[in-house]
Regions:
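N-terminal glycine/serine-rich phosphate-binding loop of ATP-dependent small-molecule kinases
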Residues: 1-96, 106-107, 111
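Glycine-rich phosphate-binding loop plus the immediately following alpha-helix
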Residues: 101-124
């Protein structure tokens, strides 16, 4: 049988679920994830810990399902909404991920709308 893996990096937890060919949930595993608040209005996530959480929940879900990773034919990934996750040329995170609840950049879209940048970027 072929299996499918869903991976969800939500705002408060990371979850992995294994489904069979009929769409039946075979196994699920999850864990809470920490939000970093280095300053008021800043919300971030440690990218290395996020990677470790993903690996852990995938490992647990596959183990609970009683299958091997080779039996998974497709992986679907979703997340918490908007955010910024920067990777360097060395395939390492440049900095902590910035979460959608972070307020430090709220003024940029307002400024871009006023000065015409938004219109230029989305010209058809």
């Amino acid at each position: 049988m072929r299996y499918y893996l869903g991976l969800d990096n939500g705002g408060t937890s990371t979850k992995a679920a294994v489904f069979d060919e009929t769409g039946r949930e075979v196994a699920v595993a999850g864990m809470d994830t920490a939000m970093l608040v280095p300053k008021p209005g800043f919300t971030e996530r440690d990218m290395d810990k996020m990677w470790e959480a993903n690996c852990e929940v995938i490992r647990k879900a596959v183990e609970k399902a009683g299958i091997t990773g080779e039996e998974i034919v497709c992986v679907a990934v979703c997340g918490h909404g908007k955010g910024l996750y920067l990777w360097g040329k060395d395939d390492r995170p440049v900095r902590n991920g910035i979460i959608s609840t972070d307020n430090r950049a709220w003024s940029y879209p307002v400024k871009w709308k006023k000065n015409g940048t938004e219109e230029k970027v989305f010209e058809r």
